[in-house]
């Protein structure tokens, strides 16, 4: 076997240097997530306007559901855009 196996080409695991970011929802309580609080909701939305995944934000299942519902309500009320700012 001359070449390396395909398992060696994986991305390196996050170590002490590249740990997870602090969860934005940890600073606020679950019941406080409201569709009118646009500044808080923007923490959970990507630059393209998509709702960030739980594994990125670090929130629980229940918190993710509340965040998703609040973002959708804010979009319906025209407080948040459906799409990001574009290119």
UniProtKB/Swiss-Prot annotation:
Pfam families: Ribosomal_S18. Keywords: Ribonucleoprotein, Ribosomal protein, RNA-binding, rRNA-binding. NCBIfam families: S18. Belongs to the bacterial ribosomal protein bS18 family. Binds as a heterodimer with protein bS6 to the central domain of the 16S rRNA, where it helps stabilize the platform of the 30S subunit. GO terms for molecular function: small ribosomal subunit rRNA binding; structural constituent of ribosome. The keyword Electron transport does not apply. It comes from the Bacteria. One of its GO terms (cellular component) is cytosolic small ribosomal subunit. Residues 1-10 have a biased composition (Basic and acidic residues). GO terms for biological process: translation. Residues 1-23 are annotated as: Disordered. This is Small ribosomal subunit protein bS18. Part of the 30S ribosomal subunit. Forms a tight heterodimer with protein bS6. Gene3D superfamilies: Ribosomal protein S18.
């Amino acid at each position: 076997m001359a070449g390396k196996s395909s398992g060696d080409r994986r991305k390196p695991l996050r170590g002490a240097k590249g740990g997870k970011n602090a969860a934005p929802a940890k600073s606020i309580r679950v019941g406080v997530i409201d569709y009118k609080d646009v500044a808080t909701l923007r923490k959970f939305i990507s630059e393209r306007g998509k709702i960030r995944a739980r594994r990125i934000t670090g929130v629980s299942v229940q918190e993710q559901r509340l965040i998703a519902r609040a973002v959708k309500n804010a979009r319906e009320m025209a407080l948040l855009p459906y799409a990001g700012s574009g290119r």
